[in-house]
Amino acid sequence: MATLADIGLAAAINILSALIFLLLFAILRIQPFNDRVYFPKWYLKGVRSSPVNSGAFVSKIMNLDFRSYVRFLNWMPDALKMPEPELIDHAGLDSAVYLRIYLIGLKIFGPIALLSWSILVPVNWTSDGLQLAKLRNVTSSNIDKLSISNVERGSDRFWAHLVMAYAFTFWTCYVLMKEYEKIAAMRLSFLQSEKRRADQFTVLVRNVPPDSDESISENVQHFFLVNHPDHYLTHQVVYNANELAKLVEDKKKMQNWLDYYQLKYTRNKEQRPRVKMGFLGLWGKKVDAMDHYTAEIEKLSEQIMEERKRIKKDDKSVMQAAFVSFKTRWGAAVCAQTQQTKNPTEWLTEWAPEAREMYWPNLAMPYVSLTVRRFVMHIAFFFLTFFFIIPIAFVQSLASIEGIEKSAPFLSPIVKNKLMKSLIQGFLPGIVLKLFLIFLPTILMIMSKFEGFISISSLERRAAFRYYIFNLVNVFLGSVITGSAFEQLDSFLKQSANDIPRTVGVAIPIKATFFITYIMVDGWAGVAGEIFRLKPLVIFHLKNFFFVKTEKDREEAMDPGQIDFYATEPRIQLYFLLGLVYAPVTPVLLPFIIFFFGFAYLVFRHQIINVYNQKYESAGAFWPDVHGRIISALIISQILLLGLMSTKGKVQSTPFLLVLAILTFGFHRFCKGRYESAFVINPLQEAMIKDTLERAREPNLNLKGFLQNAYVHPVFKDEEDSDEEGLIEDSDDEDCVVVQTKRQRSRRTTVASSNASRGSSQSTPFNQLDLGKGKPET
């Protein structure tokens, strides 16, 4: 059981760690040779040039301006100066909405902390429930006198906690509603003012039914010319190019090694570099490194060419899917948001993700296999969550000196040392839990990829959902349950079964001390480590020394990174959960959470302005997930408070808390119906307005040229295939086209407008269909 002294030691360690990280960052960021590490965003935008290109040698390495060291903390006010509209233009709406999550934390928990400390803390402190609990062998510490555990069983003081639960809920719901309304308006405004992008006109069609007489490309073209004759423009079929992508990736790796050895040779021309041919280059025959990698690259180039030819000729490489582009956003919206045929399992349409956020390997997965894959991952996630309770129990065993002494008496001489005791209880559990969770986001992302999601945003949102569930079940509930068992081990073993719920009711708020230590490790030192950027700093200088030859190489060596939504958002949600659960129970935890939200907002705002470069823009599409999880945390806090109050002899409060949970769920349904459509549906009115304005501004826009290669697989956009682009044939000069099928069972033809004829198929740079004068290619 962590005491006030233990928490003080943990706070000292984490504050010192955070200050060291911040000091190192403040000094390193102003050194010229680190400029690309701490300001890569501005280099990518082309508004910042390298300071190491001019001046004396020493000034290229070290900042000799003494005044800059005096102003080394200027990054803090600078991070707050940029107004939100400018931030959206600079970094995108996703980044701005992400920052608002931290602001919501401050808006919610600031007033809640004020109320709880002014009302609940005096109520708890002036009670003497823990004195009575000690008679039942319940372990506690002085800090627990600030919690609900100190209120006597059956006391009327619990009505104060009930009233505060209502106040906290109403305030949280008010803040959430205002934010939902604000962000929905920001999203619609952003989409309306956004520049023209291919995904605004494009729909992904999946589960295209096979036809024995027509290819997939011909089938897609025929279907949309018939059913969307006035709006269909062009399409690109989806190819299984995963093997080709692997070859291209291998070639890039070989090229990197060749560049490295060429640079090494230019620095020492007296001896050509050699490499061993054995496993990992540890043993085997030595050969000339440059000759070896040159030969490997030539070999891979031939394999890539052969694989491309195979894909051209093999119909099995064509998946039952296509990207279909339309002449207007309105036409794309109608197609994406409607059912295409009476069979709901065929011709499935959805908005195409932004081209740069496509996860191309998953497009090659057969659509029918996705259900099986997702079921398998549900089972795998269940077992991952279930078995992770073992390390959680280990962490909680560290958090309890009493539990260690009872289960391992031989360690008593060590843990009885005051400094060691404070270190074990106040710092070690939080850092061990943090280490156990390091690889979890990566594992969950791999599971999401296996499920077959086709966009990075959908992958991240699924992984984030699972991470949130994992935190809820293991990090929160698992820590409370296992920790209570360890700390109250003697009570659990000696008392009757009827008394165990009462002991748990007292022990749950006592676990606040463990979560305080975890918040300091993860939310204080962890956030400070984020701005320090140790890993990108080391990697950049290694690349700069071994691989960089030109300014382009130096730019590629930069690693600006991005906001990993799947890893960061669930962590934030854990703080919302802890804050809402413990606000009416143990208010002492709230200042630690408020400091986290304020500090993280400052750090991540700086990173978004100067460092991060997002790979895609979803216009804040993830906000409904954020809102829903905060509501879930609110309902969980009410249910846990209900259980706690019932164990404390206040069963009559149960109806009031049940009503509160029902009201909270009703509020969620209201927000879902009122605001969520802005995040999942593109209003036809907005699409028509944008189309009309675009036609007025650019009456001669060649939209087909803009769209025809937008969704070609990246491996087909290699410079070596530039000659393939010449294979694209246009039929814009036709005034009328007869859409004629190749089916032997049907001789019907469909006359389409001349506008539709301009939408002739543009499958890929190497698979085109020329309609000519209405005669299909044979």
Curated annotation (Swiss-Prot):
Subcellular location: Membrane
Membrane topology, from the record: Multi-pass membrane protein
CC annotations in GO: membrane
Protein's organism: Arabidopsis thaliana
Region (Disordered) residue spans: 738-778
Family annotation (PANTHER family): (RAPE) HYPOTHETICAL PROTEIN, PROBABLE MEMBRANE PROTEIN DUF221-RELATED
Bias (Low complexity) ranges: 753-763
Family of this protein: Belongs to the CSC1 (TC 1.A.17) family.
Signal peptide region: none
UniProt name for this protein: Hyperosmolality-gated Ca2+ permeable channel 1.4
Segments crossing the lipid bilayer: 7-27, 101-121, 158-178, 375-395, 427-447, 467-487, 512-532, 584-604, 626-646, 651-671
Domain of life, per lineage: Eukaryota
Primary gene name: OSCA1.4
Keyword Transport annotated: yes
Function per UniProt: Acts as an osmosensitive calcium-permeable cation channel.
InterPro entries: Csc1-like, CSC1/OSCA1-like_7TM, CSC1/OSCA1-like_cyt, Csc1/OSCA1-like_N
Keyword Membrane on entry: yes
Predominant place of localization: membrane
Keywords: Calcium, Ion channel, Ion transport, Membrane, Transmembrane, Transmembrane helix, Transport
GO molecular function, one term: calcium-activated cation channel activity
